């Protein structure tokens, strides 16, 4: 710790910040210090530690003092550390918190993680040794300002830093303004697209103009794929039962094609994602989706909500045949000898959740039996049923 010197924490003109990390504690070798919680800054020239509560409390040492670094992994109740081995303190060193130390290394404890990236960037700086090149390029101008104008160097440094900070602030303000402008334009375009979709939907409905049947189907396909079809909302259909009835009708129309592609059954989670993706900005809450799905069967719509014994909720076609589904599962398992739900899902092309429910249903009906071991749940054909 006797290599550290007091500093202001401000960067020199030719110095650049590389990375910083909060929640770092300094240790003098194996001994704890009062530098318990601060921000560690790595620049092209120095390693700076600044107290998180009192920013004027800063210490630093030059990177040229470092011999090598090593990492110490964390454990239970212990933070990961970077051990920095240092050269002996130079005789002309500026005053610091420690005059002497019996250790030739310091430990940097990272309480809030980030040590891996910090160590990588520190190793890069030690390899590139940018402080030597930057100091060499800055030395001619420093020589010009020596002698009676010594005080001017400090003034130029502070003014330069303030100017840089002001330029960065202006650039940030400009970027924020441009971002808000882009967001406003995007929202305006989104409104235009919604209005356009409503107009097209109305024309399709009224069959105005020379729109053929094929063009009508194509328009509907485009609108659905773009996710901007005219959705049922509380603003347009009120609230309560009427809203959920209209929503159920729209769901029945929209889910026909996806259900056919997925073998006539989908988990409610899949349905929720699919519906909200298609509705665009008019997002649907989980409660409204469940309430609408509960009305599907009573409204005599072609799809229905089904709840398995495990509590898993799915949407399926009214024509979905349970016996055929179980027979298909039995045939697949018999061909392979035995299957897990993951293997079955991969073969039939459905989610693992639905695959497991299908196998459990076949088991409940006596067609399959299980082997539940440390390797997982595996299903086998019920030989007692088939061989008898």
Swiss-Prot record:
Residues 1-88 form the GLUE N-terminal domain. Disulfide bonds: none annotated. CDD domains: PH-GRAM-like_Eap45. GO terms for biological process: protein transport to vacuole involved in ubiquitin-dependent protein catabolic process via the multivesicular body sorting pathway. The keyword Transferase does not apply. Residues 105-138 form the GLUE C-terminal domain. InterPro entries: GLUE_dom (IPR021648), PH-like_dom_sf (IPR011993), Snf8/Vps36 (IPR040608), Vps36 (IPR037855), WH-like_DNA-bd_sf (IPR036388), WH_DNA-bd_sf (IPR036390). One of its GO terms (molecular function) is phosphatidylinositol-3-phosphate binding. Residues 162-198 form a coiled coil. Transmembrane segments: none annotated. The keyword Protein transport applies. Pfam families: EAP30 (PF04157), Vps36_ESCRT-II (PF11605). GO terms for cellular component: endosome; ESCRT II complex; late endosome membrane. It is found in: Cytoplasm; Endosome. Component of the endosomal sorting required for transport complex II (ESCRT-II), composed of SNF8, VPS25 and VPS36. Component of the ESCRT-II complex (endosomal sorting complex required for transport II), which is required for multivesicular body (MVB) formation and sorting of endosomal cargo proteins into MVBs. The MVB pathway mediates delivery of transmembrane proteins into the lumen of the lysosome for degradation. The ESCRT-II complex is probably involved in the recruitment of the ESCRT-III complex. Belongs to the VPS36 family. This is Vacuolar protein-sorting-associated protein 36. The gene is vps36.
């Amino acid at each position: 710790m006797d290599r550290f010197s007091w500093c202001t924490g401000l960067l020199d003109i030719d110095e650049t910040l590389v990375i910083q990390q909060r929640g770092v504690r300094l240790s003098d070798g194996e001994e704890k210090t009062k530098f318990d919680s601060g921000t560690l800054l790595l620049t092209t020239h120095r390693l700076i530690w600044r107290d998180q509560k009192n920013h004027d409390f800063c210490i630093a040492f030059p990177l040229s003092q470092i011999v090598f670094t090593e990492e110490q992994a964390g454990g239970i109740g212990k933070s990961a550390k970077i051990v920095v081995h240092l050269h002996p303190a130079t005789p002309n060193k500026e005053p610091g918190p420690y005059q002497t130390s019996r250790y030739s290394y310091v430990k940097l404890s990272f309480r809030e993680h980030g040590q891996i990236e910090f160590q990588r960037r520190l190793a890069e700086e030690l390899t590139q040794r940018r402080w030597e090149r930057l100091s060499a390029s800055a030395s001619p101008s420093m020589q010009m300002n020596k002698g009676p104008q010594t005080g001017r160097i400090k003034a130029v440094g502070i003014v330069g830093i303030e100017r840089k900070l002001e330029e960065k602030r202006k650039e940030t303000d400009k970027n924020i303004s441009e971002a808000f402008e882009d967001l406003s334009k995007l929202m305006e375009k989104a409104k235009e697209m919604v209005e356009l979709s409503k107009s097209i939907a109305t024309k399709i409905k009224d069959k105005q103009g020379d729109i053929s049947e094929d063009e009508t189907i194509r328009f509907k396909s485009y609108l659905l794929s773009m996710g901007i079809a005219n959705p049922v909302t509380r603003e347009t259909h009120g609230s309560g039962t009427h809203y959920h009835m209209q929503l159920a009708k729209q769901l029945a129309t929209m889910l026909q094609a996806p259900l056919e592609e997925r073998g006539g059954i989908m988990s409610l989670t899949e349905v929720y994602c699919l519906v909200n993706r298609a509705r665009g900005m008019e997002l649907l809450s989980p409660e409204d989706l469940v309430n609408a799905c509960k009305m599907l069967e009573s409204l005599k719509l072609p799809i229905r909500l089904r709840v398995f014994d495990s509590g898993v909720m799915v949407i399926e076609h009214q024509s979905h045949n349970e016996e055929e589904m179980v027979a298909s599962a039995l045939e697949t398992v018999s061909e392979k000898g035995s299957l897990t739900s993951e293997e079955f899902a991969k073969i039939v092309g459905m989610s693992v959740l639905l695959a497991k429910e299908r196998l459990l249903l076949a088991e409940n009906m006596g067609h399959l039996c299980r082997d539940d071991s440390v390797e997982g749940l595996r299903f086998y054909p019920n030989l007692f049923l088939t061989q008898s």
